């Protein structure tokens, strides 16, 4: 596959420029400030781990650039309730329209249907999107190290923190990890999927663990499909997981969560 990440980021910058014209940043910021306090995303993950349970960030995703439509019958509220009933710590909801067929309304619908903290899963490149995330009710945002400079990540993290939102910073290699470790967030996502080629290997997480200092919560992302893979990660003291596609492809996502993380 071609370098899809660069393509997505270019599209995202165009979308933000158009959004700023349609609704000025000051209006979005006012909407963000008017929201009720965010739910505690980091706390929800820590609580699971403290109780010796895997902390699952369960994803709600209709489609992807590499797989096309993943879940034709897509009901975010029903999926959110199913995840909550079966032990998820948090939700991750795709809001990117063009490549993942997501939207802010999916996040709002999912969040309203449960009490779980919700991550806005999107490609954040601009302060506008952070304000937008809080305005739509998100409790956390994702920062992808492959798409941002350290200075950009620090600025977006500072803004998210001012709104009370958590930050999950995502890396795929050592260079990205070095940058991510300069942020304040305890949440460090290691994506086993290379966003430039979409190839997946769990060795990505395992290979970076020795470089991560104590106090960080490692979230392994992508490629967790079997209970043995969960066990492998937990043996290596990785107790937080972001899983989406494995759940989206079955009729009852929450039941699959319970089976995978039994």
UniProtKB/Swiss-Prot annotation:
Instruction: Enumerate the Pfam families for this protein.
Output: IGPS (PF00218)
Please give one Gene Ontology molecular function term for this protein: indole-3-glycerol-phosphate synthase activity
Matching SUPFAM superfamilies: Ribulose-phoshate binding barrel
Q: Which reaction does it catalyse?
A: 1-(2-carboxyphenylamino)-1-deoxy-D-ribulose 5-phosphate + H(+) = (1S,2R)-1-C-(indol-3-yl)glycerol 3-phosphate + CO2 + H2O
Task: State which Enzyme Commission number(s) the record gives.
Answer: 4.1.1.48
Recite the UniProt keywords alphabetically. Amino-acid biosynthesis, Aromatic amino acid biosynthesis, Decarboxylase, Lyase, Tryptophan biosynthesis
Biological process (GO), any one: L-tryptophan biosynthetic process
Q: InterPro entries given for it? A: Aldolase_TIM (IPR013785), Indole-3-glycerol_P_synth (IPR045186), Indole-3-glycerol_P_synth_dom (IPR013798), Indole-3-GlycerolPSynthase_CS (IPR001468), RibuloseP-bd_barrel (IPR011060)
CDD domains reported for this sequence: IGPS
- Cysteine-cysteine disulfides: none
Functional pathway: Amino-acid biosynthesis; L-tryptophan biosynthesis; L-tryptophan from chorismate: step 4/5
Question: Which PROSITE patterns does the annotation name?
Answer: IGPS (PS00614)
Which family does the similarity line name? Belongs to the TrpC family.
- NCBIfam families in the cross-refs: PRK00278.1-2, PRK00278.1-6, PRK00278.2-4
What name does this protein carry? Indole-3-glycerol phosphate synthase
Please name the taxonomic classification of the source: Bacteria, Pseudomonadati, Pseudomonadota, Betaproteobacteria, Rhodocyclales
Q: Which gene encodes it?
A: trpC
